[in-house]
């Protein structure tokens, strides 16, 4: 997979395939940011990525802010949707998570607090291309 990269998904099965392809690229120290409207499939995509690494008990961290997972790799899955102030992210030590070279960080709704996201990241924007299709746009920032 090389970036930028775009794919259209017409079903959950196709989204799973896209997530599995993307999973092959991931390694410790990477930060992945998923942006998109409610219902575009950010959490579903993340769950499929985690499954490829042996994590089967994942759920959205909307209320917890961050969920840690251990499988073939260590993951920290963030959801910024319910965060009201940037200070809340600093209170949980967001900078320390981002510096962790031994884990993979996945952030949903990173566009809500772009100032805390490191420049080096992979950003995935998910949008509705029509009622039953999603467009996945991948871009890597160095």
Map each language-model feature to its residues:
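Phosphate-binding P-loop
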Residues: 23-29
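Short hydrophobic/aromatic beta-strand immediately N-terminal to the Walker A/P-loop
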Residues: 31-33
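P-loop (Walker A) phosphate-binding loop of NTP-binding proteins
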Residues: 35-37
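Short beta-strand-centered segment that lines the nucleotide-binding/catalytic pocket of NTP-utilizing
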Residues: 55-70
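Short phosphate-coordinating micro-motif centered on Lys-Gly-acidic
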Residues: 3-5, 85, 95-142
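N-terminal pre-Walker A segment at the start of P-loop NTPase domains
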Residues: 1-21
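Conserved lysine of the Walker
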Residues: 42
């Amino acid at each position: 997979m090389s970036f930028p990269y775009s794919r259209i998904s017409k079903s959950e099965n196709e989204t799973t395939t896209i997530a599995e392809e993307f999973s092959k690229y991931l390694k410790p120290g990477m930060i992945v940011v998923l942006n998109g409207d409610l219902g575009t499939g950010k959490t579903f995509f993340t769950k499929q990525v985690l499954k490829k690494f042996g994590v089967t008990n994942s759920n959205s961290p909307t209320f917890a802010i961050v969920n840690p997972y251990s499988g073939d790799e260590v993951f920290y899955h963030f959801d910024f949707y319910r965060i009201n102030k940037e200070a809340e992210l600093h209170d949980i030590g967001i900078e320390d998570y981002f510096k962790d070279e031994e884990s993979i960080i996945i952030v949903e709704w990173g566009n809500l607090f772009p100032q805390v996201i490191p420049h080096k990241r992979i950003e995935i924007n998910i949008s509705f291309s029509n009622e039953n299709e999603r467009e996945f746009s991948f871009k890597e920032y160095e």
